[in-house]
Amino acid sequence: MSLTHTIDVDALHRAMHLLVRGFGSSDAEVRAVCSNLIEANLTGHDSHGIGMLPRYTDSYLEGGLKPNVHVRTVLDAGAMLRLDGQAGFGQVVGHEAMALGVERARQLGCCVMALGNAHHLGRIGAWAEEAAAAGLVSLHFVNVISRGIVAPHGGSDARFGTNPFTAAIPLKGRAPMILDFATSVIAQGKTRVAHNKGEQVPPDHLIDHEGRPTQDPRYSVIEPFGAILTFGAHKGYGMAVLCELLGGALAAGMAQHSDDTSKKRVLNGMLTVLIDPAKIADMAAYEREALAFVDWVTASPPREGFDRVRLAGEPERESRAKRTGNGVPVDATTWQEILNAANKLGVDPKKINDAAGVAA
């Protein structure tokens, strides 16, 4: 088991700001990237948090990540937008794309927004939360252009990415339902976290480089590579293909069909559907029935091993409250990878440690 540092949230922001400035990013970009990544840690999704910065660093040094660029409009057809992320930080171009889509959906009642060529968009739930905060329903289909890490159902090697699907449903007077999941049985970043902590993953999550079942996360992290399995067997596989065709081929004009493992960049395509419920529904009936259903479902008596029935998005909010008060846990291996990334960017690792309050 790896040693874990527990870092105060404000201190973590200061430390990560120092690192991200090493990309040559503007102050606004530094804030956007750090806020998004640390928010992922706060919600309990360390797989999409600051542990991604070493990968971003390698991508940047290879020329695959372009700091200080903004989303470009390729097509504006009223309720349909096609946007190019220009390989910029997903935390920046993703927010800009969502702002354009939200504005158009408010104006017209709906918007189909296609974003391509964005560097890693981070936790897709963050973009769904932006839609819900604007009172909109949203659906997000995302593909991944990088080293394949997930095997098709019945296949023995990796052919595509974790291809997340996300949805947001605003609920009157309550926090929204945010459904956000990888179509693989486990996110690749979670296998990285497990590997760094010296932990195994549960059974039926991974296969090794020969297609045999394994619980060792190293087969998703270091060569020889194996593959992660899809959730729910053929069902997750079907969802993964759906996300590849919609987020990749349709939205981005770029789908995964290469076995090149040499590049560190991670590009995402995202097809987003935004709907203003006030423009299509009887709002009184919608709000009444939505809350009635949610209350009916969550009132189910919990079975053994559970304290209560939760709605999607609740675990993240609970984690956010806990970690905001208690600090963010970062395993020592991941922290060392972050320090190594800082050094590659010309940032003194000691300054990162000092800002975070971590003893060298």
Q: Regions from the language model: what does each represent?
A:
Residues S2-I7, L12, L250, A255-A360:
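Catalytic-core signal marking the mid-to-C-terminal active-site face
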Residues H48-V102:
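Active-site cofactor/substrate anionic-group-binding motifs, chiefly glycine-
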Residues L81-K172:
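A generic, well-ordered mixed alpha/beta core segment in the N-terminal half of proteins
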Residues L136-I149, L246-D260:
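Glycine-rich phosphate/pyrophosphate-binding loops
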Residues G148-S220:
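Phosphate/diphosphate-binding glycine-rich loops and adjacent basic-rich segments that engage nucleotide
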